[in-house]
Amino acid sequence: MKPDNVLSAKNRNELRQWLEHNHLTEKECWVAVKRGRPTSDDVFWYVDAVEEALCFGWIDSTTKTLQDGVTYQKLAPRKKGSLWSELNKERCRRMDKLGMMTEYGRAVLPDMTPAGFVIDDDILAALQTDDVVWSNFQSFPELYQRVRIDTIQIKKKQPKL
């Protein structure tokens, strides 16, 4: 069964135009996207859809792959108080630097300061138990550390993921 409110957007510009006109009135939309590392301008990539959604205070959620093999990504307004991944925070920082964030996207941002992310004590203790592991972890770029640890912490708090 095809989801409701499927957009015909074929790229980020078309999605952005739709969001500009509808982000305050619509409850959701679905876009056909491809996951993976972008390799072609002729494909609407998942990351492009997510970045555009974030610019308007929206977020990705459910995906559906239909019998024809097309994957649809659901986009919807972000709920107040919802969890933010470090990856999406970084996407917002990037979109802001590029001048693409809207006032609506900025209005829903969480604490974006370095103090806004703290490694859980039990995870930190586990990393520090082994000197080699801790040394390797510290050699990773700071963003990589935050994104990887955040993924673990989110899954720890939401086991259904």
Predicted regions and their residues:
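Charge-dense, helix-prone N-terminal extensions
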Residues: M1-L161
